[in-house]
Amino acid sequence: MCIRDRYLILYAYAGRISNEEAEWISDYAKKKKLKVYAIGGIQKCADRFVDCSPFEVLAYFRNAEEVITDTFHGSIFSVITHRPFTTLIRKSVGNSYGNEEKLSDLLERLELANRMTTKIEDVENINEKEIDYAKVDELLKAHRKVAKEYLRKKLEG
């Protein structure tokens, strides 16, 4: 995979990014001289829709300048690849499923609650903040250990 563009990843399901959010993202990317690569769903503001294998997704994340997402996978891939990111929180409305509970739990466990927002305009300030990935990696390691132990006990019966 050889990518020469400087890009940000927009990882969101199709239809979840509003017209106003798409316009803001497009303006933001232009200001930062970045292309917008959409993964997870086609987006109006994307310069490119990336349709790739699960194995290639992490390579795209690893090479991104930053990430905007409203998904669990977009958030955790950003963490794993040590990218600056913002997670957009969607509230549940009527029969539509929000992401607040799942993403709040993940990011609070990793002490990254400051990466969440409900307002697209917050992305620039959030993505400019440094992340102590050494600390985050230690927290992630501890949570993995607990999860593995839980699974081991359940499998042993």
What do the predicted segments below correspond to?
Residues 4-157:
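Active-site anion-handling motifs in enzyme catalytic cores
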